């Protein structure tokens, strides 16, 4: 194994992007970046500073007053404070979903990720616009997908394991609605790039998906 590369994993909701990316990062000893955490950190800052996250310009102005950092242990820092656990709060998650829709904020996050990944190789990242927006120059691009039914079933099982009441039909409807929204959003709609390798995990287990990506990565090192 020689030089490290950067890996981008894209795909629809419920495809297991984050779980797979984290496991691949461990096997390759890469740094895992979750773009969603950056949006959550911005949302948390807006809440803490009393900024109206329903107003794009207010959130954008706030960005000049904050500093976000990541480390190799998947921790995210807001103004020097480790907020990795705090950003998991439901209130923060809801605010982040709103903030992530704003073009100005998305542009800020793109620049943030570009600066990190230009410093060195050995990063793996997931997200619904990673292959074409956040890491367009990644040496390995993966579009991880699966049928809505399989993705909904996996998500329902995950929720059940976490102790949440889950209705499969409700989850399936949510997955299909999210797919439509992601594919038709005005800014950076979800799509498969020409240089991405599609992995359909419908008939694959977790280990098979991870091993496939690790193998593809090693071919490019």
UniProtKB/Swiss-Prot annotation:
It comes from the Bacteria. Its EC number is 2.7.4.25. Keywords: ATP-binding, Cytoplasm, Kinase, Nucleotide-binding, Transferase. It is found in: Cytoplasm. GO terms for molecular function: ATP binding; CMP kinase activity; dCMP kinase activity. It catalyses: CMP + ATP = CDP + ADP; dCMP + ATP = dCDP + ADP. One of its GO terms (biological process) is pyrimidine nucleotide metabolic process. GO terms for cellular component: cytoplasm. ATP binds at residues 11-19. InterPro entries: Cytidylate_kin (IPR003136), Cytidylate_kinase_dom (IPR011994), P-loop_NTPase (IPR027417). CDD domains: CMPK. It holds the Pfam family Cytidylate_kin. Belongs to the cytidylate kinase family. Type 1 subfamily. NCBIfam families: cmk. This is Cytidylate kinase. It comes from Mycoplasmopsis agalactiae (strain NCTC 10123 / CIP 59.7 / PG2). The gene is cmk.
């Amino acid at each position: 194994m020689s030089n490290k590369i950067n890996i981008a994993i894209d795909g629809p909701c419920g495809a297991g992007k984050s779980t797979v990316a984290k496991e691949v990062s461990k096997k390759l000893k890469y740094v895992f970046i979750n773009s969603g955490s950056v949006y959550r950190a911005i949302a948390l800052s807006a809440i803490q500073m009393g900024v109206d996250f329903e107003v794009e310009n207010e959130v954008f102005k706030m960005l000049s007053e904050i500093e976000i950092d990541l480390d190799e242990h998947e921790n995210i820092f807001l103004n020097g404070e480790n907020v990795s656990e705090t950003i998991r709060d439901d209130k923060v998650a809801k605010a982040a979903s709103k903030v992530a829709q704003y073009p100005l904020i998305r542009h800020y996050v793109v620049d943030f990720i570009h600066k990190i990944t230009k410093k060195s190789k050995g990063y793996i990242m997931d997200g619904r616009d990673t292959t074409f927006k956040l890491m367009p120059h990644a040496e390995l691009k993966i579009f991880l997908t699966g049928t809505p039914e399989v993705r909904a079933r996996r998500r329902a099982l995950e929720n059940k394991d976490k102790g949440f009441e889950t209705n499969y039909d409700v989850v399936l409807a949510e997955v299909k609605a999210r797919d439509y929204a992601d594919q038709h959003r005005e800014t950076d709609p979800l799509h498969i790039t020409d240089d991405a390798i599609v992995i359909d995990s419908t008939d694959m287990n977790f280990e098979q998906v991870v091993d496939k990506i690790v193998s593809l990565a090693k071919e490019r090192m």
